[in-house]
Amino acid sequence: MTYARIQGVGSYIPQQILSNADLEKMVNTTDEWIMQRVGVRERHVIANSPDNTTTMAVDAAKRAIEMAGIDPAVIDMIIVGTATAEYYFPSTACLVQKHLNLREDIPAFDINAACAGFVYALSIADQYIRNEGAKHILVIGVDSLTKVVDWKDRSTCILFGDGAGAVILQAHKEPGILNTILHANGDYSDLITAKSGVWERESVPHLHMYGKEVFKLAVTKLGEIVDEIIEKSGLKQSGIDWLIPHQANLRIIEATAKRLGLPRERVILTIEQHGNTSAASIPLALDAAVRAGKIKRGDTLLLEAFGAGLAWGAALLKL
């Protein structure tokens, strides 16, 4: 049997840091309130730097390729999960292909599942390796949500940061991705939105979110999907070594960990330092944990994410 196995990870975050103390000067909020309600102390932001969605994706990809120890010429697919592409077209994936000077006889495309984008991209890549003969796939999660937040809205501007994370998936006989599950429900599409300026030229494409409703649904749906993927995989909760959640809200993360019976020290947390980096949050956290020596080859990881759409998903894998 052929598995899709993570061979390398990489990430990138902008240099500029926006702290809660900085936000106290911008909106009516406090460090104590943000930490209690969300769990974010600081976030990295593009601001006026040369960084953008494409450059961050490229830098994360280079680090993943380096760790994987592969020649970039062997990459036979690029999938980018992002909701904040630099262009409507071309895709971010094609721009990554250009900057990495990858060969042209490969597919390269973006998917937009908002904060669940990386898990969606990982699931698609897994299917191409299992069923279509792909050997090396570059999967990237990247977002620049600070470019679309309303900096006068204290309920949302405190949440987000910018960044990118990437993995190289390689066809392998040893177990890698065991299962993925993806769900969506467009009936809740109005709960998290950022409208395109194409149709309403006078509007500003600010992010809007009904936080209380999203929080309740996230706790419920993530709880259900982690149960579903564990049952589908035939594992017990005790077989999970690490939970790598989407870093949206510490209270949501704690609810999922409690449901799994996992202590906090078995949950990879970067939310305090990064904030919610949308599609980048899971690969950012994975990269940080691998490079810190926490997660090791052979560990069983549960990844889960929930975002606008509403779209949510989970992946269970052996590193």
Curated annotation (Swiss-Prot):
Gene responsible for this protein: fabH
Family: Belongs to the thiolase-like superfamily. FabH family.
Pathway membership: Lipid metabolism; fatty acid biosynthesis
Complexes and interactors: Homodimer.
Function: Catalyzes the condensation reaction of fatty acid synthesis by the addition to an acyl acceptor of two carbons from malonyl-ACP. Catalyzes the first condensation reaction which initiates fatty acid synthesis and may therefore play a role in governing the total rate of fatty acid production. Possesses both acetoacetyl-ACP synthase and acetyl transacylase activities. Its substrate specificity determines the biosynthesis of branched-chain and/or straight-chain of fatty acids.
Catalytic activities: malonyl-[ACP] + acetyl-CoA + H(+) = 3-oxobutanoyl-[ACP] + CO2 + CoA
Broadest EC class assigned to this enzyme: transferase
Record localization: Cytoplasm
InterPro entries, A to Z: ACP_syn_III_C (IPR013747), ACP_syn_III_N (IPR013751), FabH (IPR004655), Thiolase-like (IPR016039)
Keywords: Acyltransferase, Cytoplasm, Fatty acid biosynthesis, Fatty acid metabolism, Lipid biosynthesis, Lipid metabolism, Multifunctional enzyme, Transferase
Pfam families (alphabetical): ACP_syn_III, ACP_syn_III_C
UniProt comment concerning the protein's domains: The last Arg residue of the ACP-binding site is essential for the weak association between ACP/AcpP and FabH.
Record's keyword annotation contains rRNA processing: no
CDD domains registered for this protein in UniProt: KAS_III
MF annotations from Gene Ontology: 3-oxoacyl-[acyl-carrier-protein] synthase activity; beta-ketoacyl-acyl-carrier-protein synthase III activity
GO biological process: fatty acid biosynthetic process
EC id: 2.3.1.180
Identification of the protein by name: Beta-ketoacyl-[acyl-carrier-protein] synthase III
One GO term describing the cellular component: cytoplasm
Residues forming the catalytic site: C115, H246, N276
Gene3D superfamilies per record: 3.40.47.10
Region described as ACP-binding: 247-251
